[in-house]
Amino acid sequence: MHIEPGILSGAKIAAANLAAIALVAAQAPQLLRKPQLVLRTLLAALFFSVFMQSFHLPAGASELHFIGAMPIYLTLGFVPALLGFGLGLLLQGVVFEPADLLHLGVNFLSLAVPLLALHATLGRRLAAGAATRIGAVLKLDAGYYAGVALMVGFWPAMGEVATPFAEWTAFAAAYLPVVLIEPVFTVAAVRLLQSQAHRPLVQLCFAVPARG
């Protein structure tokens, strides 16, 4: 989901950075109201970074990553997932790919806007009671990664260099296995945490309720 340097003009990168800052600023006050979200945001950034670095390869106009979006969202919550994506991208840029820091806002929006849209629609309805059902999690994954694919298509469409449509379709198609495999991982993680939800440390670190 990374956008390569040279595709967007400096003005568009600056606009994306401002939009990213505004999105983070809108959610950050919740960390003050609920201090446990700070820990969960750090965990989200850690898990996201591990997932991203564990598997990545070129795919069409961008790169294919195992993002782990739904495991993070359903076990840590919306705000930690959203802010954790931004913090994780920042840490990965500093440690592994300094060149990616130029597009930090762009790459953050590619992940955050689909999550925001999903949370406002399917997420609120399905996340609470359906996180242990493969079919429901599959809907969340499909909705989220469709959004990521659209965002990755949006940036080249706004770019200074023409990107062949075939490259975007190759990128979008590359995420189909992720959409099919990630729900299994998500449900397993949620069920494991639910079985341990009575433990104080799990209650502090995760947003998974105990099994009813």
Could you say what each language-model-derived stretch is?
Residues A45-F48, H65-M70, L87-Q92:
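Hydrophobic, membrane-inserted alpha-helices
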Residues H2-E4, S9-G10, L57, G123-A207:
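Membrane-embedded alpha-helical hairpins and interfacial helices in multi-pass inner-membrane proteins
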Residues F66-A81:
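Generic transmembrane alpha-helix motif of multi-pass integral membrane proteins
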Residues M52-P58, L89-L118:
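Interfacial aromatic-anchored transmembrane helix boundaries in multi-pass membrane proteins
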Residues M1-A45, A142-F154:
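Membrane topogenic helices and adjacent juxtamembrane segments
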Residues T41-S49, Y73-L76, A112-L116, L138-V152:
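Small-residue-rich segments of transmembrane alpha-helices in multi-pass membrane proteins
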